[in-house]
Amino acid sequence: MLAATFDIGTTAVKAVVVNESGEPVFTGSLVIHTIETGNFKEQDPDEWYGAFCSLSKEMLEIIPAAEIGAIIFSGQMQDVIPVDAEGKALRNAILYSDGRADEQARVIIREAARRNVV
């Protein structure tokens, strides 16, 4: 049995298929572009999906699907991805490293400290 793993990271979507001994039998990676405007940091969720599909296709050209017994996913940290009722992204994902609310966070921290809120 093989295990296919996918990591949707901040810089790339990576795929590795390992055998039962943990040895890689397939590896692939596709760069993901970050849209940076000032302290805004966003990515297009459709680019994540496209990279996943491309890597899956490449993997399945080498490895028969019937040999894959497990699929494992990991992803980025606390990104915000607003979606509609069908689950389609309404806009770019706002990354965890986005700084657009830095000033608001400073105000909240300062006010919480002033009120002895933990």
Where are these regions (language model features)?
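Glycine-rich phosphate-binding loop plus the immediately following alpha-helix
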Residues: 97-118
